[in-house]
From Swiss-Prot:
Pfam families xrefs: XPA_C (PF05181), XPA_N (PF01286)
Protein name, as recorded: DNA repair protein complementing XP-A cells homolog
Phosphoserine: residues carrying this PTM: S82
GO MF terms, alphabetically ordered: damaged DNA binding; zinc ion binding
């Protein structure tokens, strides 16, 4: 299946929920929405798997790295400890702007 081949997630193609659980998000979105750093995505073991696609909006820009949202959310909980801690950190960042 697509998810097994690219993200090592045992889910058949007909069971895939591309709109929510198995949605793909960009690296930028993962960093902004879940307050993750490059090292959280790429260096922290196990490094998150991703696919590379051409940027559909700006063909001159670099390729996009797309991560599986399910795995990004799980990593964010590892980094921040809980959903509440993540929300608190977002609020602090918003106040500091």
């Amino acid at each position: 299946s697509y998810l097994m081949n690219h993200f090592d997630l045992p889910t058949c193609d007909s069971c895939r929920d591309a709109d929510d659980k198995h949605k793909l998000i960009t690296k930028t979105e993962a960093k902004q929405e879940y307050l993750l750093k490059d090292c959280d995505l790429e260096k922290r073991e196990p490094a998150l798997r991703f696919i590379v696609k051409k940027n559909p909006r700006h063909s001159q820009w670099g390729d996009m790295k797309l991560y599986l949202k399910l795995q990004v959310v799980k990593r964010a909980l590892e980094v921040w400890g809980s959903q509440d801690a993540l929300e608190d950190a977002k609020e602090v960042r918003q106040e500091n702007r």
